[in-house]
Amino acid sequence: MRFIALVFLVGALAIIAVECNSEGDALNAFKMNMLDPNNALQSWDPTLVNPCTWLHVTCNIQNSVTRVDLGGANLSGILTPQLGVLYNLQYLQVENNSISGAIPRELRNLTNLLSLGLENNKLSGTIPSSLGNLKSLRWMRLNSNRLSGEIPISVLKLVLWGNLQLMNVSDNKLAGTVPLANKTGFAITTIVQDMKA
C-alpha cells in the first residue's frame, strides 16, 4: 500500500513539474521575443524549476502561473503564441509598452483569464474572434493600439455571459458599431469605442 501511495505521489509531482516547466518555457519564449532595455525580465531564468520566483510573475499554491504584470516595463517585441499554455493565468497585464504585431489566437486557451490588459501598445491586425472563448473575462483593455476591422460577434457575446464589465477598444482603427445597451441584466458592462462620424 505504501508503494502505491509513493508511486501516486511521484506521479503527481511529475505532472506539476511538467506543467511548471511548460509555463516557464512559454514565458521564456515571450522573453526571447522582447527587447528589454530596462532589464525587467532579467530574473526570468529558464534553468529554474518553475517561474514562480521570477519578478512580475505570480503563482498559486500549486506553483502555476496566475499573473503576469509587465505594465510600463518599456518592452518591445511581439506577443508569442506560447502564452496560450498558461492555462491558470488570471491576469495578463502588458499595457503601456511598445508591443507590436497581432494578438495571438492561442490566448483563447486562457479560460481562467479575468483581466486582459494590452492597452497603449502598437498591436495591429484584427481582434481575434477566438477571444470570445474567454468567458471568465471581466476586463478587456485593447485601447490605444493599431487594431483594425470590426469587433468580432464572439467577443461582443462575452457581455451575454454576465462577467465582462469593461471592454475598451477606443483609439484604434476599428469599423462598425457596438450595441449601446446591456441586455443581460447580469452585469453593468461598459464598452468604450471611438465615436464614428
From Swiss-Prot:
LRR repeat residue numbers: 86-110, 111-134, 136-158, 161-188
Superkingdom of origin: Eukaryota
Keyword Signal: yes
Tissue specificity comment: Expressed in phloem tissues of leaves, stems and green fruits during pathogen infection.
InterPro entries noted in UniProt: Leu-rich_rpt (IPR001611), LRR_dom_sf (IPR032675), LRR_N_plant-typ (IPR013210)
Role this protein plays: Involved in biotic and abiotic stress response, but not in systemic acquired resistance (SAR). Acts as a negative regulator of HIR1-mediated cell death responses. Acts as a positive regulator of cell death induction by PR10 by promoting its phosphorylation and its ribonuclease activity.
This protein's name: Leucine-rich repeat protein 1
Natural source organism: Capsicum annuum (Capsicum pepper)
